[in-house]
Amino acid sequence: MQTFVRVVDTGSFSAAARQLSIGQPAVSKTIAQLEDRLGVRLLTRSTRGLTPSEAGLRFYERARRSIEEADEADLAARGEGAGLTGVLRVSAAATFASLHIVPRLRDFLGSHPGLQMELILDDRVIDLVEEGVDVSFRMGDLADSAATARRLATGPRVVLGTPAYFAIAGEPSGPADLAAHEAIVHTQGRAGAWAFARLGSQVVVTLQGRLRTSSAEGVRAAVCAHLGLTIASTWMFAPELASGVVKPVLQDWTLPGIDLWAVYPTGRLASAKARAFVDFVALAIAGDTHLRGDSVSRRAGP
């Protein structure tokens, strides 16, 4: 398995042979024997060199994981588990990562000098197994009922906009007034009706925005450009709320909070690297007023 992983990582038999300190014929023979045993072609030749086939990519991800877990077991047996090594692939929404993960990475990476990290930043939900992701930080409801997830926090949602926008459009005095406002809608976020609650009563409102964007950063930019108001998590506008660039309204009404989850790939045990990083993030955000700490582990459900 290690030989195959090195070939995929380097893109050639010769480079893998140099890294493994063996001859190129030995590498070629090992791969041929592996393909014969599995009964599938694992590698294809292209202008970029050797690339894994669809079956090869599936085998590569599992083989890489097995090698990493074996290395971690060796470290644990020798009492060296604190020194995490290898590559940790983390997925998160770009805005959340920029505001709440990246600023905290120095301490984590400083504690694990042998560890490398890759951040896959995308507002869309990606296939963690296909992308080789160790852990993903997701907001809101989880659709994958087979995924293993840990809830790290629940953050409040508010209606907000800039003082300049409200100076022109006026501040809403109740949820029903939102129908008369320009709304910025996040198409990758929560959709549908919003239930506002106050003193036992409930008002349901659907935002009808003319401006829709697929990214949280697009929502932030549009709101800060005075184009309208939005319903958003306070973590998403933490710097702007602190500086007064945006202001919340309808604060005597409450909206459903939004959960922050750490999600692990389906069918895999969480690696020591992933568990350590999730523990670190959970501790780091425990005092964040925009992400009220509320750590709960469970299987993700609808």
Regions found by a protein language model. Give the residues of each.
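A short LG(V/I)-centered, amphipathic sequence patch enriched
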Residues: 35-52
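Central regulatory/effector-binding core of bacterial HTH transcription factors
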Residues: 85-148, 294-302
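Short helix-boundary/capping micro-motifs
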Residues: 6-21
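Conserved amphipathic alpha-helical core elements
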Residues: 34-35, 246
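C-terminal effector-binding regulatory domain of bacterial HTH transcription factors
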Residues: 61, 114, 234-243, 253-302
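Hydrophobic hinge/microswitch elements
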Residues: 204-248, 255, 266-267, 284-288
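Short helix-loop hinge/linker segments at domain boundaries
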Residues: 47-50, 57, 68-91
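Flexible hinge/capping segments at coil-to-helix
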Residues: 146-157, 161-184, 199
